[in-house]
Amino acid sequence: MKKTFIFLYCVVLFISTTLAVEMKKTQDFNLRIFDQHPKYNNNFEPENGVLTVNLVKSILNETTGIPELTTMSNLTTVNKQGRIYSPELFKYFFADNSDAPDRNNSGKNYPLDITLTMNLDDKSNYFYDNQEFFPIDGRGFDVDQQFRNYYDDESKANPKPYHNYHFCAKITNSRFTYKGFETFRFVGDDDVWVFIDRKLVVDLGGLHIAQEKTIDLTKLGLVVNKLYVIDFFYCERHTSRSTIRIETTIELQCPWYDFCGVCTGNGLSCCNVTRDCDDGNPCTIDLCPEPTAVFDLKDISANCRHQDRTPTDWSVTDKCNTGKCNVSTGIFVTNITKCIPQNSCKAEDHCDSGLGCIFKNLCTDVCSTGACVDGKCETKNSKICIDELDKGVEDKCYEYSCDPNVGCTKKPRCLQKSENYNPCLNSFCEVSTGECKNTTIPPNLCDCQCDGKLNKCQIKSCNADGSCKPLPSLEIDDKNPCTIDACDETTGVITHTLSNKCGGCSICNGVTGDCDPVDKKCDDGNRCTTEVCLLDKATNNGNCSSKPTTECDKGDVCMVYSCDTEKGCVETPRVCPSKGKCQVGKCVPGVGCKYEPRVCKADAFCLVAECDEIVGCIQFEKKCAADNGRCQAGICKNATATEEGTCESVDFDPKPFICKTAAVVSVGVAVGVAVGGAIALGVFIFAGKKGYDYWKASQGVTMATSNANPLYESNPSGGENPIYTSPN
């Protein structure tokens, strides 16, 4: 007897000091429900239909996270069979559209949240079974009595109570660690779609009586110990039944909760934008806090977000409007940009919506280049006139200058002046040096009598016979084809008048006499435009034309080239916008913007870091797959300073029914429940078998059979059970 008590003591000590791992008895999930009504969505309460597969695409949209129809035409067979009368409203089956107008077929819905609890059965399946599944009776739209007008089909002959028959529900973004044996079974009506790893695995679309589908996850090519996403979508679209049964061995995990405590929620179950976030400013868009924000719920209003509204009256590329929102009315007031000249070379002209401020160029006189230097018009000097008249090649026998009346001119360097004219000298220029030289003309050829025969515009010259031969003054012809030369015979005043043959931004070429366009005369003071002078050859008139400059673009696809109307070209690295929360934009040289998955880093071995399309990077508890997932739990141990993190397998206690064997009396069989093992044996030690029977009844411990008391069990392996007393 003494040995027996020592043995029992050791068993009690072992049980009381060993970590007990028990299968979760329940799993709670947030069911996001979207109350629908036939008034707002005619895809609800249509004619009875049939089971329709391929109604939705086989891959879940990664950005929206909801199913998409395979076709958007209501004339296709699949949509007709699936009773999708208005395909454009399908997107509101599982997405908030509570702000839609209160009119027929607006797609308006009413989001609600409930908790769905799945229980563990004796076969280690989690199940939910409800053959009268009406979770939002009297809620949503049906708070208003006028919407409570749908009853069971049998209501006339056998009156039954009202129910809310029109709603869709979803459990999305839930995770599970694949253990290698899981199954999923659904029985119910109407539409049901289940996606695992964004791939459609249960396809029970359409209006139909209860249908069944079982999925063996071992057939899906999943990898043991890898984390997967599961998304569940369900709709009830027609009277008179609403049934649902779910059975699964999948152990789901919520990756994150919103500030309302809702799994993968958006915060709208406890935050109402109108009630909680209205800042009274019509120029802002009011939003509830970020879903994963952490704060005391009484401080929701203090954590709301407010974004500035942007104008919709004009294009954001309009360079002339800098409209502001009137905080009193919420109306954007057009504010034309004032174009203020930055220097004395320009005058205000107008604002172009595509180009910005355009200024009038004041540097347009004949001796201005059209350019503005240090705030002043640049004047043509001899060098500029050489460029203009002789294409940059100086003729040393001429002097170049700009005449305010005619523009650039060149005059012979060695020409005798009329007032000192000596007809017996022949003045000429040495071309190579520009040196002036004279040769003497014989007197008989130059010294003739011209007295009284010359007017003020003539000079003395002699014929070979010595008679007078008046010649025009040498200064009358300025050798410029662009001027009209004249001399007053009474006064001797010589004038050179610029011909008006060239107009606008063109000038007359002093060498050829042609009209040449001058782009500089079109400078509009906007550094983001390229100005050209276009010559109309029929009229010899030059017209200015401005267009956005192309000089800023250097061809690097990873740089953004822009232009500031005052500063000129600006270069900034291209920022590729992210796509959703989980695709990061990256610029690849020579290619441009590409997307790559956002990398989220876990802070510990026993945390999983990944990206969620709703909130971005998240971290949550790592679930390890056990060696024998049916009978063991995977336990995660974080890394230490000396050891790496590991996953270990620990037996369930009590063991699930399928794991019990006849080889030994397991702790689970012996005790019934892990936490009560030591108590049960202690009761037996001090109270005997009858005491244990009383304890079992008082605790409500569930046993497989009426003889499940371990005190009645002999060792089937032939050994001695020290706590077994034969009934004989």
Curated annotation (Swiss-Prot):
Keyword terms of this UniProt record: Glycoprotein, Membrane, Signal, Transmembrane, Transmembrane helix
PROSITE patterns reported for this sequence: PA14
GO annotations of cellular component type: extracellular matrix; extracellular region; membrane
Membrane topology (Cytoplasmic): 688-728
Cell compartment(s), UniProt: Membrane
Primary residence: membrane
Bilayer topology term: Single-pass type I membrane protein
Signal peptide: 1-20
Residues with glycosylation annotation: N61, N74, N104, N272, N326, N335, N438, N543, N638
TM regions (residue ranges): 667-687
Domain PA14 span(s) in chain numbering: 118-266
Topology feature Extracellular, residues: 21-666
Family listed: Belongs to the prespore-cell-inducing factor family.
Protein's name according to its UniProt entry: Protein psiK
Lineage, top ranks: Eukaryota, Amoebozoa, Evosea, Eumycetozoa, Dictyostelia
